A protein has these predicted regions:
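Bacterial N-terminal signal peptides that target proteins for export
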Residues: 1-9
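Secondary-structure end/capping motifs
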Residues: 264-339
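Short, glycine-/small- and polar/acidic-enriched structural segments
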Residues: 48-188, 194-197, 213-219, 234-237
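Pocket-lining segment of extracytoplasmic ligand-binding domains
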Residues: 118-120, 202-295
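Conserved C-terminal helix/tail region of periplasmic/extracytoplasmic solute-binding proteins
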Residues: 330-355
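A bilobed periplasmic-binding-protein/Venus flytrap-type ligand-binding module shared by bacterial periplasmic
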Residues: 75-77, 143-154, 251-270, 321
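C-terminal motif of bacterial Sec signal peptides marking the signal peptidase cleavage site
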Residues: 18-21
C-alpha cells in the first residue's frame, strides 16, 4: 500500500514538473521573422537570387582602328589596362581597315567587336549576309580642307573652283564626300577642279613644301600638318560643317562600331556592357581633353599628345546607338550608293544592319 502511494506521488510530481517546463518554454522569447530579415540584409559579397544581380564581365576581343576612329576608345583601353572595366578586353590597335575586315570574317575570326570606317561597316554586313552588324556610331566627319603658303584664298567651297586639290582616300569615304560636297555647291568634280590622290604622308609633305596649295586631310593628319608648318598651313574648311549646310537629312558619320552577330547572340550582356563603357569613354575624351590626349598618344593612336590635344575637338566625337542609328546614317549610305554602289557593297542595307 505504501508503495502504491509513493508511486502515485512520484507520478503527480513528474506531471507537475512537465507542465511547468512547458509553460516556461512557451513564455521564452523566440527569434522573430523580422529579426532574421534584418540580419540577412547586412551587405554581403554575394547577392541573393532575389536581389538585383550585377552583370558579370566577359572576355571580349576588341579591335580599334588607329587615327580618329580610335580616339574615342582611349579611355576604355586605359581602364582595361588598369582592370577597371567590367568586361575583360583583349584589344588590338589596327593600322588599317583591311586588318579589321580579316579579323571579323572567316571561319576563325580574331575579333568580336571593332571600330571601322562607316562604309566598311556596310560592306561587312553585305559581305557576311548579316554576320556583322553595327552596334554604335562613334565619330562624325573628320575631313578638313587645308591651304598652304600662308594663303587665304579659300573661305567657301565655291573658292575651290579652278584649283588642284590633293586628297586621301581614293575609292573610299573621303573621295565620295569631297565629290558630293563639290557637286552640291555647283562644282563639277571632273571639270571645275583637279583632284589628285596620295596617302596622308605624301599629301602632308606636299603641303609643307608648298607643292600642294590646297589639300584635304583627315584629323589628326590635318592637325599635325598645321602644327608642324608653324603657320604656313591653315584650316580653310571643315567638311563636316559644309556637309551640314546641305541639309541632307543625315549626319556625316565616319566611324561605326561593329560586332559579329554570332557573338552578340551568344553574349548579349557583354555587348551591353561594352556599349556602356564605350559611351563613357567618348564622354571622358570629350570633357577631359588634356588627360585624354596623353592617353591617345600613349596608345599610338596619334603621333603625339599636342597633336591629339588639338585633334580631339576637331573629331566631332559622338555616341549614337539603338533606334537613332538608322536615321543618323541611312541618308549618308544612300549618297554613297548613288556615287558608287560598290562603296556600300553593291546594295543599300536593310534595317537589320542595326543592333
Amino acid at each position: 500500500m505504501k508503495h502504491k502511494k509513493l508511486l502515485a506521488m512520484l507520478l503527480a510530481l513528474s506531471m507537475a514538473f512537465a507542465l511547468t517546463a512547458c509553460k516556461k518554454s512557451a513564455e521564452e522569447p523566440s527569434v522573430s521573422p523580422s529579426d532574421s530579415v534584418t540580419e540577412s540584409a547586412e551587405p554581403s559579397e554575394t547577392p541573393s537570387a532575389e536581389s538585383s544581380t550585377p552583370v558579370m564581365g566577359e572576355d571580349v576581343r576588341l579591335a580599334v582602328l588607329s587615327g580618329p576612329t580610335g580616339i574615342g576608345a582611349a579611355k576604355l583601353l586605359s581602364d582595361s589596362d588598369a582592370d577597371a572595366t567590367v568586361n575583360h578586353y583583349e584589344y588590338t590597335i589596327a593600322a588599317d581597315n583591311s586588318e579589321l575586315v580579316a579579323g571579323l570574317t572567316g571561319s576563325d575570326p580574331a575579333f568580336d567587336i571593332a571600330t571601322v570606317a562607316s562604309n566598311v561597316a556596310v560592306n561587312l554586313y553585305n559581305k557576311t549576309d548579316g554576320g556583322v552588324k553595327i552596334i554604335a556610331l562613334g565619330t562624325l566627319g573628320v575631313l578638313h580642307i587645308l591651304e598652304s603658303g600662308g594663303n587665304e584664298t579659300v573661305s567657301s567651297v565655291a573658292d575651290l573652283a579652278g584649283k588642284t586639290i590633293w586628297a586621301v582616300g581614293q575609292g573610299a569615304n573621303p573621295e565620295y564626300i569631297l565629290r558630293y560636297v563639290l557637286s552640291e555647291n555647283g562644282l563639277d568634280p571632273d571639270k571645275d577642279v583637279t583632284i589628285l590622290f596620295a596617302d596622308a604622308t605624301e599629301v602632308t609633305q606636299k603641303l609643307m613644301t608648298g607643292e600642294a596649295e590646297v589639300a584635304m586631310l583627315p584629323v589628326p593628319a590635318a592637325t599635325a600638318a598645321i602644327i608642324k608648318s608653324e603657320g604656313k598651313v591653315r584650316a580653310a574648311l571643315d567638311m563636316t560643317e559644309e556637309w551640314d549646310t546641305l541639309n541632307t537629312g543625315s549626319q556625316l558619320i565616319m566611324t561605326a562600331v561593329v560586332a559579329r552577330t554570332e557573338f552578340m547572340e551568344q553574349h548579349p550582356d557583354a555587348v551591353a556592357v561594352f556599349l556602356e563603357e564605350y559611351a563613357g569613354s567618348i564622354d571622358y575624351v570629350n570633357t577631359n581633353v588634356d588627360d585624354a590626349a596623353e592617353l591617345v598618344a600613349g596608345f599610338g593612336i596619334t603621333p603625339s599628345a599636342p597633336i591629339a590635344r588639338q585633334a580631339i575637338p576637331q573629331c566631332h566625337l559622338t555616341y549614337i546607338a539603338g533606334k537613332d542609328m538608322g536615321p543618323a546614317i541611312s541618308g549618308y549610305y544612300d549618297i554613297l550608293w548613288q556615287a558608287d554602289p560598290a562603296a556600300v557593297g553593291g546594295s543599300l542595307p536593310d534595317d537589320g544592319i542595326y543592333y
